[in-house]
Amino acid sequence: MELWDKAERLWTRVKNWKTVRGWHIWKLKLVDARLYFVSMFVGLLTGLVAVPYHYLLYYLFHLRSGFFASHPAWYWHIPLFLFSWGILVFVMWLVGKMPLIGGGGIPQTRGVINGRITYRHPFIEMVSKFVGGILSFSAGLSLGREGPSVQIGSYVGSLVSRWTHILKGEQKQLLAAGAGAGLAAAFAAPLASSLIVIESIERFDAPKTAITTLLAGVVAGAVASMVFPVNPYHLIEVTEPVFAFFVQMKYFLILAVIVSVCGKFYSSTMNAFRHVYAKVNSPAYVKMLYLVLVAYIISLMQVNLTGGGEQFLLAQAQNGSTQIMWVTAVMLLHFVFSVFSVSSGLPGGSFIPTLVTGGLLGQIVGLVGVRYGVIGQENVSYIMLVSMSAFLVAVVRTPLTAIVLITEITGHFEVFYPSVVVGGLIYYFTELLQMKPSNVSLYEDMIHAPDFKEEKRYTLSVEIMTDSYLDGKLVDELSLPERCAIINVHRDGKNLVPAGTRLIPGDQVQIEMDSQDIEKLYEPLVSMANIY
């Protein structure tokens, strides 16, 4: 009888535990709903900041190209040249004051999400990134809008997380949502915006992060579509070539080999020149003078190659040249110009210059195919789109983002299948060539820079998700990596002593670790708390 009473009491406790846990999980679902709503607000704010950024870049490019197209008298070039030089010197001064606004912004965003970097003054830095990116672009440099848009979005996510008092473990979701919304605002591609967060920034798939990023991306993409109702990439006419299966595979294999080798050269040159540029002891104003001189000479020859070269790419895709040598010369010129521009460290991304180089490389391969009768002239734009996706895979090493982005922004689903085939081959070839993703190289250069302020220990905040590995575990029973420890558990507005605490869904857990381990441990620790 006594045994029966004990069993009954135990069963009652189990039922009560399940009931309490059920109510707790139900309450967490309401908290998640709040987070999803806030992420949509982040997407809206990011769109309201990043879309005007895109519009101003578009406006200033056409203002600049109109000036050069009018062939003004020689003396009008002097004030524009000096003004452009002064602009870049000012932007370089801004970067010196706030190093995080330099470059594209994707490596910085990754650093903030994994806890290595902190946005101490997000609003001031966001405004500086906005202004610095516009001024650098207006000077004619070969820089893209996507990196700054991503970082602007992460700044918005940081600000909103402060305003709404979001829990520590959820802040990274808003940062990721803002980053994805930034890319969606730059290209009106919400699906690709979620994928770039998964592949290049977070580097793994946490369900809540994916949902918040997609929601924010859809809202930001809607804002972009209102301001830019006509996507210029939709104007590209594509005709799919008709050839036998084995001929098609052979052609795609050749394209994959060419793009892989060129991608290796592109990445290696970018990395090498960035290190050489950093070691040059000339004053910043002298470096900016050389940069403006190169940009101005190219503007006089082919103004559409400035500003990343996107307008030149669109023109070639719609009604391009048939001269192989001329296109090759222009591609090499654009490549050298992009290397100079990106290596300067000025605010601006390398995504669009990479996209343009890939498109022009595809045009060359397509024209060679026309010359040998493999495809027709009307099929060249088709090869260009496939090559754009392929070159992004080779350089950035984000195959899903590259394939979906090109399909999404062009609306041509007929390039999806060849992009998957060529992209898969290239991903394998780049593994053989031991190519490191460009954003990873930029991130490593950033955290190993002499002026980078590094702490000895970092704290990672994670949220325990329902049915994750850490759900229900006693802190004392966990075998964490060496010199890695849980220092606090935040639950229902209270801080609990970790020892003896059983983790439950919704707990905000702070894990302290050495600085050299944060990149290695971020993914496994967050996965243990988030993935189910």
For the regions a protein language model found, what residue spans apply to each?
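Short, low-complexity disordered segments enriched in Ser/Pro/Gly and basic
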Residues: 452-458
